[in-house]
Amino acid sequence: PEAVVDAAFRSVKKASELIDMRTHHGEHPRIGATDVLPLVPVSGVTLEECAEMARALAKRIADELAIPTYCYEAAALRPERRNLAVCRKGEYEALAQRITDPAEMPDFGGGEFTGQAARSGATVVGARDFLVAVNFNLNSTSTRRANAIAFDVREKGRPRREGNPITGRIVRDAEGNPVMIPGTLKGCKAIGWYIEEYGIAQVSMNITDIRATPLHVAFEEVCRQYLIRLRYAGQLP
């Protein structure tokens, strides 16, 4: 495991030398040149051990490379940061503001938006089990429809609204947080987007718990949602 961790550190260092986030644009959510770095227990190591190594790696990246880091999933130092989307909130463009906010700043290397942070962004380091990433192609160019399907199937679901389910006012709890309608697939995250290269919209999904939702179950549920709105056209690994 130590060799893997060292190789991961050197990869982050090389990415920081080659990639300048100040000129980066793209479709996929990201917060830094090395966006997310999970350690996965393949053999001879436990998830808990991976989490300890991930925290140490996150601190090393911040200390030696001056790249701010968040810890997520099993390595999270705050419960809400188990979710990658919470660490990535606002993406790279929001990092300059978040890095000085005590409630939002990185776990390591926060407090100042340095020149290195501006160039490399932040890195989210963690430990998790195996993840399945799959993109479902739609016979459509509509990002709105792709997102609607993603919101219906992802575990987080969609905000509850008053009246019109699309344009109605979002219902909030006593603390001002949106009240969510859970999606149909446990352990799944999904978003919809348009892929200009292919000329189609996609639902991009990460299955973070393949025991709760095997790939074939996700496939069948996404197809069911497609049939409600659109026509399924294929998938990419």
Annotated model-derived regions:
Residues 1-237:
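Long, contiguous binding/interaction regions
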